[in-house]
Structures are given as C-alpha cells and as structure tokens.
C-alpha cells in the first residue's frame, strides 16, 4: 500500500545512506508561462527559505543527454528521479515530468498534494490535474503574485503534450530556451528499463521500501471499492494450522529410540539443502568494455564526451579508445576536467582490459597474478608521478584548481582499491620526509585524506610520527621561528593527535631521545590528561631503549649524588639548598648522616672546609627535625677505630656541634652509661671513650662537666692530665706573647712546640683563652698618628704583626678556623696596615671555610671600614690595598667596593709615577749605594718622600736590591722578604720599565751558574706580587722550547725540579709561622694549584721524565711529586683521574710509577710484592663511594701491567666476581671500575654474565606430577636478576653488528617458556573441579615465575635487538624462521589469560613480581608487562623484514588454535600489518613457521582461558571472519583472520576492484556487472 503523501512517511530524500544522482536536464512549468509570469514566479525566491530543494518529480519523457522527440518514445517504461528530493511532503508529478521552481512547493507550509506520487505511462497527462487550483482556493504563489501586482495571477496554461514539449539543455545551463530553439537529436535506441531510485530507503535484503512501478498487474494497481476506501495492504498469509511451539511434535519423536538420530538427519538435510540453494553456481558473465583504435580527432572527441556529464557512460563504453593509459590518462583527465567519477570509470575500463590481456596470453595462474601485481605497481607509479608533477608546479596558473582535482582523483583511486596501498602510502611518506619546507603544507593537507589508512598499521604510523617530528625540528630553528609559525602550529596539532589518539605509533626505539623535547612542546602539560599520556609514552620508550653510552650505563647512585652535593658546597657555599637537596635525595636519614661523616673524614678529600660544611648541614637537618644525635652515635658505634678515616675531623665536627649546643652532651653521657663502655677495663683507644675526652667543656653545665670527669676517672683517665696539658700550652703561648698574656700565667716556662696529639677539649679551651686575651688587648686612650694627637677608640686592638702571626700559627695548627674567624674579627679594629693586610690574607687563604661558616662578607666589610678609617687619618699602605682587592675579587657582591679600591690603588701608583725626581737622585752613584751603612734608611726616605724617580735611579736601586737577593753583598742585613718588599715599593714609579728589568734579570739568573739561589728568591718575589707563579712557569716553558736559549741554561732537569718544589705546600707538621710575604706566597701557591691543576700535572710529568732521562729520579723528587700529586687527587678527583688515565695510556712509565706510589699511600695498599691479581682483589675489596676514582686508576695501572706480563684473564675474573658480589650487596661501584677497562675486558665480563644467566633453569619442577608441581625457587630468580643487572649495565659493550650467537638462544628460551605455559594451561583445563590447594599454590608459583622470566627475556631481547638482524653469512630462511618464532612466542605469552591476570597487573618496573592476589588489586604505576611485551614486539617488527612479519601473521591465523580468541585483537593487525591472503591470490602459502609449542603436540589442545571448555575457543573463532583478500578494504569486517574448518578454507568472496564497473556493456544483459557478494554475507568456499 502507498499511503497518502500527508501521512508523514519518511521521504527518500532524507535517507542518509544514498548519494544524490545528478538529475537530467528538466524544465520548469514556469517555462510555459509568459515573461511577466515568469518574473512573478521568481520574485518570491529572493526570500530566504529553510531548505532550497526541489520536489520529487517523475520524469517519464526525457533521458539525460537525449533529445525530446515529438513522437512517442518506445514502449519500454522508464522511471527517473530528480537530483534532489523535497524536504516537504511529496509533491505531485507534472505531466511533462519537470520540477516546479515555485516557492510554494519548496516551503514546509505548502499545501499537500491531493494525489499520491505514482508512476504512469508516458502518454498519460493526468498528473497535470494537480496544477489546477482545487475548490476555488488560491495557492500561495497566486497570493504572492496578487500581493505584488495588485491583481489576480493569470490562470495556468493548458497541459502540453509530452511529446510536443521540448526539455531544456543539460543540467548546469541555467538559461531557459524555447522548444523551437532546441536542436534536434537522435532517437534513443537503448531499450528502456526501470531503475530503482537511488534515494529510496533500502531495507534488508537489498529491497526498496514502497517502490512498485506501474505495470498494470500489481495488486496495488487494482482499483476497487476496498482499495479506494482503505488503501492497499501487504498482508502476510499465516497458516491456521501452525502451532505456537514445536515441543509436542518434537517430544513425540524423542520418545522413540531412533528419534534423536532422525531429528539429526532432518536437520542435517535442511542444512545441506540451504547450503545448496545458497551457492552461486552460474559463472559471471561480466566482461570489460572493449577498446577500439581511433584517430586522434575521434579520441579527443571521445574524451570531450566523457567530460560531458550529459553523455551516458553506456554509450561511451562502445568506443573506448586505445592508447590512453598510465600518466597520459591522468593528464588527459586533468586537461579535459573530466569529472572524477567518470575519470575513475575510464581508469577501471583501461585497467580491466590490461589485466584481462594477461589471461588471454595462455600463461599460468601464478604468472598471471605476478603480471597483474606488476601492472598495478606500474600504474601506482604513474599516479605518483602525476601528483609529484603537480606539486612541483606550485605557483603556476590555475595550480590550486588543478591540485584540488588531482588530489580528489588520486584519493578516489586509492579508496577504490585501484592502487597498490603499500607502494602508494610508502611513497606518500617518503615524499613527506623529503619535502622542503615550502611544500610541506601541501603534503599536510593531503595527509588528512590518508590519515586513517596510514595509522592503521605501526609500520606506517611510526614512520609518519618520525617524519612529522623531523619537520617540526626543522621549522623550529631560530631563523624560522616567526615566519613559519602557522606551519609549526599545524605540525604540533598533528603530533598532538598522534600522541593522544595513536600512542603506540609514538613508541620510537631509535629516535625518542632526539624527539622527546619536541613531543613535550606539542602537549599542554598543564592538562593532567596530556601530562599522564606523556609520562606513559616516555616510560614506554625508556623500557625499550638501550643506552650505548658508558656514562648513561653508569648513572650515579643516590649516595654518589649526595657526595657530589657535599663537594659542591665547598665551591658554591650554598648550604641551605644543599641541605634540602640531600634530604630529597636519600630518605634514609641514618645513611645520609653516615655519608656526611665519612665524607668529612675520608682521606680522598682534603681541606678543613669539609668539617664546617658538615657542621652547617647537620645544624640545618637538626632544625628540620632529623635526630642527628642518634645517627652520630650509631655511626661511631659502627665505625670504630677505622684506619681509613681521619677521626680527628669527626671529633672536630662534634666539638663544633657542642659549641653551638646542637649536639646533646648529656644524652651522649647517658648513652655511654647505659652502654657500659666506660668501665675501668676499657682500652684508651675505645672510640666512645676517645670522644668523651674530645668534648669541649667551656659551655657545659657544672653537673655535666662533673659527670664527664667521673666517667673519665672510671676509665682510668685522670682529669688532672687534661688540666696540666692546658697549663703547659698556655705557658708556651704566653711566653711568645708577653704583651697579651704577661700577667695571666704564673710561670713563663716556654714549651718548644705544642703537642700535635691534642684533644678538642684542650684545643677549644686554648682557643677560648686566646680570644679572651685578644679582646682585652686594646690601645690606650690616646694615640699619636702622623704627627697629630687624636682621641682613640678604646676598642682599637694593639696587636702587632708578630703577635698576629703567632696567634694565627697556633689556631691554624689546631685547625680551629671558627675561632680564627673570631680573632680576625677582633683584629679588624687594629690600626696597623700590616696586621690588617695579614688579616685580609688570612680570610683569603681560608676563603671556602669562612664562607661556609658565614663570616667572609662580615670580615671583608670590617676590613674595608678599617681601611677607610686609616685613609682618613693618613696614607694607607699598598699591602693593605692589594690584599683587600684580591679578597674582594672573590666576592661577587662586593664589586662596587673593589672598584673603589682599584681607584685608590691607581691614584697611589700614578702619584708616584708623576712626581718630580728627588734631589737625592741627581747623583745616583753617591746618593744610594748598597755598600753605604745607611742604605736602608736612605731607601726608606726615598720611597716614602712622595717624590718622583727617574729610570736611571730606579735601575741603580733595582741593581742594588737584586745584588742583595743573590747574596753578592753580605754587608747589608736585609732578608729576602724585606728586599722583595722594597722591590714592590719601587715598581709604582715606572711599572713598565721595572717589569722589563725584572724579566731580563730573571732570564739572566736562569742562564747563570748562580741559579742555586732561585728557590730562595722566587717565593718572596711571588709573595710581594712582583712575579706570579703562572707567569714564571710560562716564561721557563718558552725558554726551554727555544733550542738556542735552552742550550745556555745549565741543568734543565734541576730547573724543572726547582719549579716542582716551588709548588709543594708545607707539610702539616711544619711550623706555619709565616710573615706577610711568606703567607702571601702560600696563598698564591694555593691559588695556582686550584686554578691551574692541569699545568701542575704537566710540570710533575715533565720533571719526572726529564730527571729520569738525565740522572734518574732521586728520593727528593719522588717525595715532592708524590706529595703534590696526592694533594691534586684529593682536590679534583674526577678531573685529575682523567688526566692520569691519559698519561697512563700514553705510556709515561716514570709518571705511572710515581702515580702508583701515590695511590698506594691513598689506598693504604701494602701488598706491593703480591701478584697483580691479588692486588686487584685488594683494590676492589676496598672500593667505596669515595675511593672509586682512585681504585679505577689503580686497576688501570694493574691492567697495563697485566697486558705487559700476559697474565691472561686474571683481572677479568676478579672483576667479574667483584661485580657479582657488589650487585648482590645492592651496590654499584663495580660499574665505575669496569667502565675504565678495555672494551675486550668489558665484553668478556658481559659474556660471562650472559652465560650464567642462560644457565639458570626457568622453572624448578618437583618430582611427581610434572604439569602442576612448581616449587617456588626464589634463589634462582634472584640469581638470574643479578646476572641480568650486570648484563644491562654493560650493554654498551655490545658491538654495532650485534652478537649473533645470542639470538637463537633467546628464541629457544622463549619457546620453552611458551611450552611451559601451554602445558600448564592444558593441565588446568583437564583438571577443572579437582584442583587442590597445593595445585593452586603451585599454579601461583608458576605464574610468578612466568612473569619474571618473561620480563627478563624481554629485557634481554631489548639489549640484544641487533642480534636478530639478518647477517650476510647466515641463510636468510633460517634467520627469518627464528624471527617469526620469536614474535609468535611474544604474542602468545603476552596475550595469554592467566587466572590471576599477572601479566596485566604486574608492571615491568621490577623484575621480580610479588605474590599478590588479583582480588582488589590496583596496578602499580608503571607500564604493564603485557604492554611492554607488545612494545618490544613492535621494536622488533620495525627492524625485521616483511617476510618474518607475514610468516608470524600466517602462523597465528592458521596454525595456532589455542590462541584463536585473540586473532581479531586490533593489536595483532596493527603490529603485523597488512598480510596478503594466500588463498585468494592463488599462490601457495610459504612454509609455515614451526610451532614454539610443538613439544606439547601430544597433549590435548589447550585454551588460554581457564573459564572456557576445550572447544569453545574454536567455536568462538569459527564464527569470526578472517583473511585480508585482494580488493577488500583493510578496515572492513572481512579483513580479519581466515578459518579452516573440515579441510575447507572459509573466507570472504573476493571481487577484483577493477571489475566493480558500472555501465560496462553497451547493451543491458542479465549479469552485466560484477556484484560484490560480500554485501550479502556470502563466503567463498574452497576445498
């Protein structure tokens, strides 16, 4: 029944599944009106309408492109439909079959038609009745006409006969022509046939809803009373005898014994009947349209007709010209602007004929398939060339239109499956990679078309990700930052989409480190989603990456990072930041305090700055809530009297903490009494008792002091011994400083020197006593200065230079720098220039320690204030200005003060240089002579007179002073320091002339035989600033490089030895009573060793080599070199060690010998006569976080000795054992030791670890039932983890070509792991319902072991990824087979459904899974093991050839029944990529990969899911589509795995895309088109 048009049925034009067909040329009924009427009809169209669509009209008279004849057409009926359906109700059909362009029919308020839409014969004009106004009513268009013209519209004309009505021109020509002006056309000869409207709604089974053309014999065409009143209904005839259920009949049959068999036979017969009826037996009669040979003119005319949409394709199919193929075909389509759908039709016709030509040649099927594939590749290459040509023509005329057409055409060819997907998409990605920045936007626009196809498989997706990231890296260069900003935004958008929606394509094993920052810049890290995604991607990439750098493999442990922070404090002086960073680095506060105390006392560091750094850090941690008292006592208990630690520094730290009341002495005494170590039978050397003796007593309460003395007395240490020592020291010091302590000490007995073995209780008491004495040593109420009596401040210190030198000597020998800082603070109130200069030099010498204490800035400001006071009262001394400038240069915040001080210095020097010559210089020969007894007084008068000095006078005085220095004049009693100070005062008069004379004198001294005085002359010259150590070393180096000058220098070896001695600092036990000049020399010495340590090492090496070649190395030279080298090693461990390694590799035997002695002293090695291997064991055994660089050096020395003595693999064995032991103890020092070994030695250690790893059994099975009894073998897992750690850390030793022998072992291990899994799953299925608790526990043990071994083997695969590459020497088939087996094992294990889901719940952050039940378990942060396994498989597939990937896919599809339920997993198709179906291509499949679980073939086929019966997986998979046939879209349902059932392969019905051709035959036949039976869910069955 066809309901009324107003019944509200769905209109065909609304159906979204059907495209609109271009309608034929039609004429509006308005064309029959006059011009004025036509204008009235068009006027309302200017108003905006909701939808501008034409009503549906049945065309019974015209055909697209045909001429309307005046005679009736043939009697074959035809039904055409307009191009656009109406959005309103169904409109009536006009007699001439044309739509009406009236506003009334296109608006939703139009009056519904009184007649239903009905097709009628051509000669019928009854439809024109609908044009006549009914019931005298006025239509809306008439009302509009009346409103505009003011009079009623003219009545419509009479109907025009259809065969007398001329239709307009073809669609697209908007002009309306009269009937007479239409050109005459030929009569249509093609028989008319009814066509289903393309916009009709399609029902199931390809039926069209409510479409029954008028034939006269349809039930709907019968007009009777019932149909006239009620309409026509399609009623289903239901049999009255049918019952509601089949139970009674079936139940009766089941009562009989043979009833069940009979029913089975009936159902089997019904199935066979249905199968026989469903088979298509008739072969296809489709033939491609033939091609004919045409002339050029006819070919051009044919192409123009093809470009004309009004010319039907069926007519053009008769004369398809030869010679249009390849790129020429595409160029013709572009030049003629042939519509895309018609251009694709031409390409299909040409392609179908080309492919059909291969079959007509009588070749075999396999050859035909090969030729067809070759032709398709060539055709794809032509398409690529066509598109490349257009892209290269960018900027030409009409380029945009041509490019738009070309992109649309090539996209249509691609999606019609007329191109080779792999070749075309590969070319697209290659073009994007090679595109210049100017053409990248064009390729990005095309990228949106092929985005889904590219991202469907990892092979393409990863390549696209790298290409986009590389382009983004190029355009983000600074020179393109602004001009290419839109391109940067577009690339960032694509990359962001990749990361968010296609995360697996951004897993880049080889380039993640290069593009990581770019990926981060494309994301919004403020968004939690983007942040989580980036962290996930970064972690996944880190899991599958292998560092090839030694530095990365040996990353610092937390302990080493903390030690680096400790070292940095001594140079940065930022205690607060370091304290916070240390607390964040190590959570174990006990370990943190232990490392700090060990760093303070280790012999592998130097300087008292460590002590005060430790004190400040401990005080910071104390304020942060850390119980440092407990941790310090715990450290002392564990340490004992360790000879390797300088315990005096530990006691110094504790004494400083006691001074600042940070360390609780009372709590320590309680701990001692509770411990009971202070009994009378304890030894004096007990560390607890020794600390008790070290505690300062100055600020302790009386009861605590009494308790300490009591405990000491019980331990056998009388308190009077400490008091007597303090009294002796005070007497000794008071004897040297009578002006300060003259009345405080009863006796003045002078002690030669204070004992070095003094406790900090004594040192602290002496320091407090000295500070009190200095604070009371002040000047009188008045003083005379510069001849003027001025009132003096009572707080002005009366210290003299000698007194300051003595006090500084005592405190520096004690190491009590905090007390020295207080003394210097009190000294700043002195008005003596020398004392203030010495105080500034003292601060400069202990700069790092004073900075850590926090006193440097305050002391510098106080010294500057004293300098300003002296400047107001008189002329300050040059020494003070020099000292303040040198100290201020080390304080960045005091740059303004230094600038002012430099101005003062320049003013003083310029004043001396510009002053007029003194009268004393008129006769220099008699004025000043070193033989004159009054030489010194005259010189003082000359230098302090403020007058000038000419160059001759300066030369005379300079000669006199140098004679005194060289000892030529012994009558003048001037020391070297005083003489050099005079030289320094002489220099400001003429600095350049003085420097020239000094250089000539030094060069002459080097060449003279009296050079023995050089070691005594240089230190004071350096101390006063006339000579610098760096300048002198550079001068000697230049002189020795010149052969002419070097030949005049006597004994160059001794000269180099003197330079070396010049750099050796004084020994700790040596007296440090230094005056201003000597102290400055040691300050310059310290500065040179810190800044120019490399030059110092060169001096040592040069002196050793020169003296060894001359007369051998004496003990003095060896001692100096050893002392200096040890100091440098402790100051700059890492840099000096690297220098020494270079010297060792350069075969400096003498330097290596001295270096070995130095290392023996540092490492306290005494087994010098033992074999090298024993020494190596001792060195490795004593390695810790501090001695690591020195042990590296020592082992390198031993390794060189081993190579000379050919000791074999001795040290390699020792190092391997050390690596195992250190790894078992959770240490990492062995990494640093191995890093310096030769590559061959490192490779041997790694190979031994790999051998031991592969020797560990995978599972420890118990006796009895081998299938379910798995005992927990934690020891084996820990051992495997240990060796795996060693292999991972030494992965950088793997050569670039890989280790080919490891690949087959890993494949076998993975096969064995899969075999164990299959056996376990089979046993679980066969024992369902009878599993005991023991079996459950055994299964859990098995799963945990499986997770560990799977993770460990995956890590080994990542490490040895290059081992699976195809070498030239190995047969390719064998390598491909191993690669496929490895992929199969990884896929099967990773997707196996274990009962506890341990592979999904257990992250791969740790190799050892913990026994946690899956109930209520939340996955830990990290990448799940399953995801990690698939990432590893992806990294392998990136490097494997396509053959391995295809073999793996075929095996998983065809011969892996236990895992059929995962065959349709998207991850399989994404990783393995498109695999051609061997069955549909008529090519026999290649040899299948052997099953990794072949050993389990005798067991029943298991299923990975324990909840499914044995056959459920097969039944589930058999209902799933499979295979990727030729011509089927990749993303359709049919592009999945094929199934094998009862010897037959079931797959989708294949249809060649070249044969899906419409209008192929000139005459309509029964089966003239290729139908894709896939739409009917049909399958092709092959036996």
From Swiss-Prot:
GO biological process: regulation of transcription by RNA polymerase II
Basic and acidic residues bias locations: 66-79
Molecular function GO labels: transcription coregulator activity
Localization: Nucleus
Composition bias type Low complexity, residue spans: 102-114, 1490-1514
SMART domains: Med12
Keywords for this protein: Activator, Nucleus, Repressor, Transcription, Transcription regulation
Subunit text: Component of the srb8-11 complex, which itself associates with the Mediator complex.
The protein, known as: Mediator of RNA polymerase II transcription subunit 12
Species classification: Eukaryota, Fungi, Dikarya, Ascomycota, Pezizomycotina
């Amino acid at each position: 029944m066809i309901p009324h048009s107003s019944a509200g049925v769905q209109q065909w034009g609304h159906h979204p599944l059907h495209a609109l067909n271009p309608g034929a040329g039609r004429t509006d009924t308005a064309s029959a009106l006059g011009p004025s009427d036509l204008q009235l009809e068009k006027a309302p169209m200017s108003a905006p309408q909701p939808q501008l669509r034409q009503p549906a009209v049945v065309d019974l008279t015209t055909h697209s492109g045909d001429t309307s004849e005046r005679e009736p057409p043939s009697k074959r009926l035809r039904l055409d439909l307009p191009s656009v359906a109406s959005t309103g109700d169904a409109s009536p059909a006009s007699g001439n079959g044309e739509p009406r362009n009236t506003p009334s029919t296109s608006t939703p308020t139009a009056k519904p038609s009184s007649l239903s839409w009905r097709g009628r014969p051509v000669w019928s004009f009854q439809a024109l009745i609908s044009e006549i106004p009914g019931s005298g009513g006025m239509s809306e268009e008439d009302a509009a006409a009346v409103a505009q013209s003011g009079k009623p519209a003219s009545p419509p004309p009479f109907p025009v006969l259809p065969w007398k009505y001329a239709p307009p021109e073809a669609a697209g020509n908007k002009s309306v022509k009269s009937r007479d002006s239409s050109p005459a056309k030929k009569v249509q000869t093609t028989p008319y046939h009814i066509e289903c409207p393309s916009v009709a709604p399609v029902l199931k089974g390809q039926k069209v809803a409510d479409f029954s053309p008028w034939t006269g014999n349809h039930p709907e065409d019968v007009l009777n009373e019932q149909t006239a009143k009620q309409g026509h209904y399609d009623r289903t005839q239901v049999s009255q005898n049918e019952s509601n259920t089949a139970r009674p009949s079936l139940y009766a049959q089941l009562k009989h014994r043979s009833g069940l068999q009979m029913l089975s036979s009936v159902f089997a017969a019904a199935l066979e009947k249905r199968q026989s009826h469903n088979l298509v037996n008739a072969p296809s009669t489709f033939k491609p349209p033939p091609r004919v040979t045409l002339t050029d003119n006819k070919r051009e005319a044919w192409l123009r007709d093809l470009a004309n949409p009004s010319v039907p394709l069926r007519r053009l199919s008769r004369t398809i010209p030869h010679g249009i193929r390849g790129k020429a075909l595409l160029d013709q389509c572009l030049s003629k602007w042939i519509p895309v759908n018609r251009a694709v039709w031409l390409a299909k016709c040409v392609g179908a004929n080309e492919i059909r030509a291969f079959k007509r040649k009588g070749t075999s099927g396999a050859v035909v398939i090969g030729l067809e594939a070759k032709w398709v590749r060539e055709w794809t290459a032509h398409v690529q060339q066509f598109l490349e040509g257009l892209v290269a023509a960018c900027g030409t005329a009409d380029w945009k239109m041509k490019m738009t057409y070309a992109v649309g055409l090539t996209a249509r060819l691609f999606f019609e499956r007329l191109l080779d997907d792999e070749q075309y998409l590969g070319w697209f990605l290659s073009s994007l990679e090679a595109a210049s920045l100017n053409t990248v936007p064009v390729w990005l626009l095309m990228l949106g078309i092929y985005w889904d196809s590219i991202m469907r498989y990892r092979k393409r997706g990863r390549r696209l990700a790298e290409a986009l990231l590389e382009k983004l890296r190029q355009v983000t260069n600074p020179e393109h930052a602004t001009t290419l900003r839109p391109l940067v935004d577009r690339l960032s958008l694509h990359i962001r989409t990749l990361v968010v929606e296609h995360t697996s394509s951004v897993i880049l094993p080889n380039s993640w480190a290069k593009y990581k920052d770019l990926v981060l810049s494309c994301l919004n890290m403020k968004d939690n989603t983007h942040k989580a995604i980036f962290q996930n991607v970064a972690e996944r990439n880190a899991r599958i990456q292998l560092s090839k750098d030694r530095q990365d493999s040996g990353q610092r442990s937390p302990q080493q990072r903390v030690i680096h922070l400790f070292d940095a404090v001594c140079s940065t002086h930022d205690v607060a930041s370091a304290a916070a960073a240390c607390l964040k680095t190590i959570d174990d506060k006990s370990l943190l305090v232990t490392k700090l105390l060990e760093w303070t006392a280790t012999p592998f560091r130097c300087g008292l700055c460590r002590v005060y750094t430790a004190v400040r850090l401990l005080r910071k941690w104390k304020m942060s809530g850390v119980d440092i008292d407990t941790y310090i006592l715990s450290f002392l208990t564990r340490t004992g009297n360790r000879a390797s630690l300088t315990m005096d520094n530990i006691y110094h730290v504790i004494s400083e903490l006691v001074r600042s009341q940070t360390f609780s002495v009372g709590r320590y005494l309680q701990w001692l009494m509770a411990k009971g170590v202070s009994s009378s039978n304890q030894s004096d050397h007990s560390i607890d008792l020794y600390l008790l003796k070290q505690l300062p007593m100055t600020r302790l309460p009386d009861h605590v002091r009494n308790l300490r003395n009591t405990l000491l007395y019980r331990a056998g240490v009388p308190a009077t011994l400490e008091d007597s020592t303090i009294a002796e020291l005070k007497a000794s010091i008071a004897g040297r400083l009578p002006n300060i302590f003259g009345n405080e000490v009863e006796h003045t007995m002078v002690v030669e020197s204070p004992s070095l073995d003094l406790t900090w209780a004594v040192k602290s008491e002496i320091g407090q006593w000295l500070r009190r004495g200095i604070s009371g040593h002040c000047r009188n109420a008045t003083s005379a200065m510069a001849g003027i009596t001025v009132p003096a401040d009572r707080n002005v210190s009366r210290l003299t230079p000698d007194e300051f030198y003595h006090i500084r000597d005592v405190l520096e020998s004690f190491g009590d720098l905090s007390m020295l800082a207080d003394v210097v603070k009190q000294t700043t109130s002195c008005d003596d220039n020398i004392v203030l200069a010495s105080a500034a030099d003292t601060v400069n010498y202990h700069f790092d320690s004073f900075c850590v204490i926090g006193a440097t800035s305050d002391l510098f400001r106080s010294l500057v204030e004293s300098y300003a006071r002296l400047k107001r009262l008189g002329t300050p001394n040059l020494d003070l200005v020099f000292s303040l400038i040198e100290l201020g240069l080390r304080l960045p915040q005091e740059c303004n003060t230094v600038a002012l001080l430099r101005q003062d210095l320049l003013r003083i020097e310029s004043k001396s240089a510009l002053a007029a010559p003194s009268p004393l210089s008129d006769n220099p020969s008699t004025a000043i002579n070193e033989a004159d007894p009054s030489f010194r007084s005259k010189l003082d008068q000359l230098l302090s007179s403020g007058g000038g000095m000419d160059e001759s006078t300066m030369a005379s005085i300079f000669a006199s002073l140098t004679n005194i220095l060289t000892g030529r004049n012994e009558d003048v009693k001037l020391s070297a320091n005083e003489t050099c100070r005079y030289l320094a005062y002489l220099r400001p008069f003429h600095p350049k002339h003085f420097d020239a004379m000094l250089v000539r004198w030094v060069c002459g001294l080097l060449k003279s035989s009296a050079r023995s005085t050089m070691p005594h002359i240089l230190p004071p010259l350096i101390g006063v600033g006339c000579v610098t150590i760096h300048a002198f070393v550079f001068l000697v180096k230049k002189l020795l490089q010149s052969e002419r000058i070097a030949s005049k220098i006597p004994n160059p070896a001794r000269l180099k030895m003197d330079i070396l001695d010049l750099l050796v600092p004084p020994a700790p036990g040596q007296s440090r009573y230094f005056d201003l000049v000597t102290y400055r020399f040691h300050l310059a010495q310290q500065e040179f060793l810190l800044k120019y340590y490399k030059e110092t090492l060169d001096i040592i090496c040069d002196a050793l080599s020169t003296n060894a070649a001359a007369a051998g190395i004496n003990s003095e030279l060896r001692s100096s070199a050893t002392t200096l080298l040890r100091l440098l090693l402790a100051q700059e461990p890492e840099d000096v060690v690297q220098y020494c390694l270079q010297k060792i590799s350069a075969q400096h035997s003498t330097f290596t010998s001295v270096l070995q002695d130095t290392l023996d002293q540092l490492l306290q090695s005494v087994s010098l006569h033992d074999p090298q291997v024993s020494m190596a064991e001792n060195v490795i055994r004593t390695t810790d976080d501090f001695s690591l660089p020195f042990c590296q050096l020592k082992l390198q020395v031993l390794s060189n000795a081993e190579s000379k003595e050919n000791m074999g693999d001795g040290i390699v064995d020792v190092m391997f054992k050390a690596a195992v032991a250190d790894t078992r103890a959770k240490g990492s020092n062995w990494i640093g030791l191995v890093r310096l070994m030769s590559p061959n030695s490192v490779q041997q250690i790694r190979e031994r670890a790999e051998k031991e790893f592969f020797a560990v059994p995978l599972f420890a099975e118990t006796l009895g039932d081998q299938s379910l009894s798995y005992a927990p073998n934690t020891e084996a897992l820990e051992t495997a983890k240990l060796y795996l750690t060693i292999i991972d850390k030494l992965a950088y030793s793997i050569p670039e070509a890989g280790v080919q022998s490891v690949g087959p072992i890993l494949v076998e291990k993975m096969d064995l792991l899969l075999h164990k899994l299959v056996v376990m799953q089979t046993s679980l299925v066969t024992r369902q319902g009878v599993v005991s608790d023991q079996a459950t526990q055994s299964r859990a043990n098995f799963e945990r072991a499986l997770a560990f071994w799977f993770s460990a083997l995956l890590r080994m695969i990542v490490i040895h990824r290059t081992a699976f590459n195809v070498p030239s020497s190995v047969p390719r088939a064998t390598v491909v087979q191993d690669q496929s087996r490895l992929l199969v094992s990884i896929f099967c294990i990773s997707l196996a459904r274990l009962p506890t889901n341990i592979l999904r719940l257990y992250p791969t952050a740790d190799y050892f899974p913990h026994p946690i039940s899956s109930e209520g378990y939340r996955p830990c942060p990290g990448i799940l093991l399953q995801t990690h396994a698939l990432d590893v498989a992806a990294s392998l597939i990136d490097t494997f050839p396509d053959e391995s990937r295809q073999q793996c896919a075929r095996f998983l599809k065809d011969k892996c029944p236990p895992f059929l339920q995962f065959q349709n997993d998207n991850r399989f198709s994404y990783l393995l990529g498109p695999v051609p179906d061997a069955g549909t291509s008529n090519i026999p499949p290649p040899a299948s990969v052997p099953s990794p679980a072949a050993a389990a073939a005798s067991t029943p086929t298991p299923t990975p899911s324990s909840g499914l019966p044995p056959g459920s997986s097969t039944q589930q998979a058999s209902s799933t589509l499979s295979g990727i046939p030729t011509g089927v879209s990749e993303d359709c349902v049919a592009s999945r795995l094929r199934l094998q059932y009862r010897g037959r392969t079931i797959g989708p019905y294949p249809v060649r895309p070249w044969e899906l051709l419409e209008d192929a035959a000139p005459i309509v036949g029964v089966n003239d088109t290729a139908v894709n039976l896939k739409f009917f869910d049909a399958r092709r069955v092959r036996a």
